[in-house]
Amino acid sequence: MTARIIDGKIIAADLRAQVAREVERVKHDLGLTPGLAVVLVGNDPASEVYVRSKHTQTQAAGMASFEHKLPADVAQAELLALISKLNQDPSVHGILVQLPLPKGLDTEAVINAIDPAKDVDGLHPHNAGRLAGGQPALAPCTPLGCIILSKTVHASLEGMNAIVIGRSNLVGRPLVQLLLNENATVTIAHSRSRDLPALTARADLVYAAVGRPEMVKRDWIKPGATVIDVGINRIPTPEGKTRLVGDVAYAEVAEVAGAITPVPGGVGQMTVACLLVNTLRAACAIAGLPKPSV
């Protein structure tokens, strides 16, 4: 068996196109232009790349894009004041603070300062609590992308056995809640779970988000299972360079899985696309409009 490759690049492009069509509709019919504000603190090169990508894709979708760059030594009070200003700005419907923040800043306090209605990263305790309670909420973008990718393979996840390897607040925990909302039967595991290979081998859906390069091996996977690899790890090559790999040993797992996401080109492609989805949904909710079709 050779696994079907779940091409995140193509799926994300289609999702962005759907968002753009909905944005055009709400702008034309309702006079609403969704707006996303991204706050970047410091000059971390990787963060700058992510922010540029978000800016480009936000504008391409027809949304308003607002960038706010602050120095690494910015005072906590100044950062919180900016967030308060964005909370009150009617042209801003989504607020994202690029993480990680420089040392000395209280990340939890910053996230908690964002208006939950504009929390398009889905990290505010209000949204996390609503998600855990099975209520409508803005969900973190990467787990949302995982669900969308899974549903390109399976029209319904209802009744399927799923395992989430990883328990972070950013991916693992919210992904479990989203899967429960899809009526999947979910096991949450982590690097210290006992007999992890046996747990994983029972799953129809495997989500690897533990941050360990190529940890999930071929003999962990039930034949025909769908494998969603959230990991992004850089490892050295014999030539003295580095390459990106996921948490799944891709080449060997692809021989037994029914479908699998590559790294790169899988889940990572979906994160910004789902950020656009959340921004559109937030804009409609704030304006008292029906939930968009995407």
From Swiss-Prot:
Which parts of the sequence bind NADP(+)?
166-168, 191, 232
**InterPro entries the UniProt entry points to:** Aminoacid_DH-like_N_sf (IPR046346), NAD(P)-bd_dom_sf (IPR036291), THF_DH/CycHdrlase (IPR000672), THF_DH/CycHdrlase_cat_dom (IPR020630), THF_DH/CycHdrlase_CS (IPR020867), THF_DH/CycHdrlase_NAD-bd_dom (IPR020631)
Q: Which UniProt keywords apply?
A: Amino-acid biosynthesis, Histidine biosynthesis, Hydrolase, Methionine biosynthesis, Multifunctional enzyme, NADP, One-carbon metabolism, Oxidoreductase, Purine biosynthesis
**Listed GO molecular functions?**
methenyltetrahydrofolate cyclohydrolase activity; methylenetetrahydrofolate dehydrogenase (NADP+) activity
Cellular component aspect of the GO annotation: cytosol
Q: What is its EC number?
A: 1.5.1.5, 3.5.4.9
Gene Ontology biological-process annotations:
L-histidine biosynthetic process; methionine biosynthetic process; purine nucleotide biosynthetic process; tetrahydrofolate interconversion
User: PROSITE patterns annotated for this entry?
Assistant: THF_DHG_CYH_1
The question of whether Cell membrane is a record keyword is answered with no
Q: Which reaction does it catalyse?
A: (6R)-5,10-methylene-5,6,7,8-tetrahydrofolate + NADP(+) = (6R)-5,10-methenyltetrahydrofolate + NADPH; (6R)-5,10-methenyltetrahydrofolate + H2O = (6R)-10-formyltetrahydrofolate + H(+)
**Pathway as given in its UniProt record:** One-carbon metabolism; tetrahydrofolate interconversion
Family listed: Belongs to the tetrahydrofolate dehydrogenase/cyclohydrolase family.
Q: How does it assemble?
A: Homodimer.
The record describes the protein's role as: Catalyzes the oxidation of 5,10-methylenetetrahydrofolate to 5,10-methenyltetrahydrofolate and then the hydrolysis of 5,10-methenyltetrahydrofolate to 10-formyltetrahydrofolate.
Q: What is this protein called?
A: Bifunctional protein FolD
